[in-house]
Design a protein with these regions (language model features):
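Conserved Rossmann-like nucleotide-cofactor binding loop
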Residues: 27-28, 169, 254, 278
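Conserved catalytic-core segment of NTP-binding enzymes
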Residues: 232-337
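Structural motif
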Residues: 21, 60-64, 133, 217-219, ...
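Walker A/P-loop phosphate-binding motif and the immediately C-terminal alpha-helix
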Residues: 130-177, 239-240
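Short gly/pro/ser/thr-enriched loop/turn and capping motifs at secondary-structure boundaries
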Residues: 88-90, 111-113, 171, 277-280, ...
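Acidic-aromatic/histidine active-site loop/patch
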Residues: 1-131, 181, 185-200, 285-297, ...
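P-loop/Walker-type NTP enzyme "switch/lid" segment
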Residues: 166-245, 332-338, 342-344
Length: 373
């Protein structure tokens, strides 16, 4: 049965900074407490003037218009939002200036925006992850293998990395990584996800793969769930991107609504094309669909043999930037059967290609603790 991930407060470690709610209006207080609960946090509710210490340390300050006057003398700080009570009261804008509020909000119209703003404050969101979609120009082009290798290479560098299996008919990327028995959620568990998904909760819920300490993989299982709704793909990818680092999505050639959503959230797409005439013709049709959703589409050429088409001609014919040529990986078929993750062998064609590509698109992303171990 599909189970949506819901946000809740993290356990263990230091207590995260909590939002501060300042209002004596009971309906407004109840509404704000419900929104905070949906964002995974338990705010402090104060009905009078707040202590200065709480004002300064709160992750976000939500001030009801009925308490704006009580707070006007507090020191200026970022993250103050004023909740208006009367749409016809023009004085709320004057009080917002006196308070130093960043925004004036009216509920319920601003509820979705406020939910995201609270969750961002609680999670401490930084720059979003670079998101790369990988898909094949024809069947069997090796897109899934390249997607796994990109994620493995990033994890070996200590980057926070999330690999997302966007192909429900691909058999499961966890098998390619040798992690099909690893405990954790798969796509059928998340098919009901809607709205805001906590990035921290998602990272904890996904399988932790042996030897790949910073790599989390959201894979399909071997069940009979045919697809996930685009809303679930949107929510899960948004959560994965909020943590920074790299997100890699393996996208099917036939773009269902969820795959289309994955492309729209990506920064770059890599189209893997064997250097064969029919493969290039097929890739041209795939590329037309991809370009409708994403501007930065690059071709990765796989030479099938000495008589294949030159890579630069393929790129020119597809009207794409050439990301590079991916030579055959010796022993790859045996490695995959034995559960050896693609790209794990340093110095191999996969690792070299992925390293060069990551140097180009992620030149300044810092590593996190815990790489390959």
């Amino acid at each position: 049965m599909s189970k949506p991930i819901t946000d809740h407060a993290a356990t263990g470690g230091p207590e995260p900074a909590r939002p501060l709610v300042l209002t004596g209006n009971d309906p407004l207080a109840e509404h704000l407490l419900r929104i905070c609960a949906a964002a995974g946090t338990d705010p402090r509710l104060i009905r009078g003037a707040p202590p200065r210490e709480l004002w300064e340390e709160a992750s976000l300050v939500l001030v009801g218009d009925d308490r704006a006057g009580h707070c006007a003398a507090m020191p200026r700080r970022p993250g103050v939002l004023l909740l208006g009570l009367d749409l016809d009261d023009a004085g709320v804008w004057v009080r917002a200036v006196q308070l130093g509020a960043e925004h004036v909000l009216f509920l319920p119209d601003a509820e979705t925006w406020l939910l995201d703003r609270i969750a961002d404050a609680v999670e401490g969101v930084g720059p979003p992850a670079r998101t790369v979609a990988v898909l094949g120009g024809r069947g069997g082009a090796g897109a899934s293998t390249l997607a796994c290798a990109l994620a493995v290479t990033a994890a070996r560098r200590g980057l926070r990395t999330v690999l997302v299996d966007g192909d429900p008919l691909g058999g499961g990327l966890d098998i390619l990584l040798g992690g099909e028995t690893a405990a954790g959620l798969r796509w059928p568990d998340l098919a009901g996800s809607r709205g805001r998904v906590s990035g921290a909760e998602l990272a904890r819920a996904l399988p932790a793969l042996k030897r790949l300490g910073t790599l989390a993989c959201l894979s399909w299982d071997r069940g009979d769930t045919p697809a996930v709704p685009p809303e679930a793909m949107r929510s899960v990818l948004a959560a994965a991107r909020r943590g920074g680092g790299l997100v890699v999505v393996d996208v099917p050639r036939r773009l269902d609504p969820a795959a289309g959503q994955a492309l729209e959230q990506s920064d770059t797409a890599l189209l893997v094309v064997p250097a064969e005439l029919r493969a290039v013709a097929a890739a041209d049709r795939v590329a037309a669909s991809v370009r409708m959703r994403l501007d930065d589409v690059r071709v990765v050429v796989r030479p099938p043999g000495p008589f294949g088409l030159p890579a630069h001609r393929i790129a020119r014919g597809l009207r794409m930037q050439l990301a590079g040529v991916l030579d055959p990986e010796p022993g790859l078929a045996v490695d995959l059967e034995q559960g050896v993750p693609p790209g794990i062998r340093e110095g191999g064609p996969l690792a070299r290609f992925c390293g060069a590509f990551l140097d180009e698109v992620l030149p300044t992303v810092p590593a996190v603790e815990g790489g390959v171990y």
